[in-house]
From Swiss-Prot:
Record flagged with keyword Repeat: no
UniProt source species: Panax ginseng
Leader sequence segment: none
NCBIfam families listed in its UniProt record: PRK00136.1
The encoding gene: rps8
Family of the protein in this entry: Belongs to the universal ribosomal protein uS8 family.
Primary localization: plastid
Record-given protein name: Small ribosomal subunit protein uS8c
An individual GO BP term: translation
Self-association state and partner proteins as the record states: Part of the 30S ribosomal subunit.
Domain of life: Eukaryota
Length: 134
């Protein structure tokens, strides 16, 4: 039985965000690096750096937190895994869902790599819906 690396990084980021931690360390694979690049480009995380420990590569993510002293702390990251190893979810480019009217993003795995819903619509290709982020 294999590991679901995408679910692992989503859970790590969600737990760190709820615990108000600023830094998260996740295992580095090709898939996680591509997903993290999308999160960085879309502004959901502040910084990424690669770290090696005992011949294993890790990604160290710096999360973006919105702090307001008048109101209580609010999580800014909502992540949901959609397609999973036991139930794969595929969509063509016309049926890719819009999250919060385009505010959130859908991350897809396509034949041209991992990309956001906007990029997939522009290139007119569908794929496996990996996760929603809003």
């Amino acid at each position: 039985m294999g590991r679901d690396t995408i679910a692992d990084i989503i859970t790590s980021i969600r737990n760190a965000d709820m615990d108000k931690k600023r830094v998260v360390r996740i295992a580095s694979t090709n898939i996680t690096e591509n997903v993290v690049k999308i999160l960085l480009r879309e502004g959901f995380i502040e910084n990424v750096r690669k770290h090696q420990e005992n011949k294993k590569d890790f990604l160290v993510l710096t999360l973006r937190h919105r702090r307001n002293r008048k109101r209580p702390y609010r999580n800014i990251l909502n992540l949901k895994r959609i397609s999973r190893p036991g139930l794969r979810i595929y969509s063509n480019y016309q049926r890719i869902p819009r999250i919060l009217g385009g505010i959130g993003i859908v991350i897809l795995s396509t034949s041209r790599g991992i990309m956001t819903d906007r990029e997939a619509r522009l290139e007119r290709i569908g794929g496996e819906i990996l996760c929603y982020i809003w």
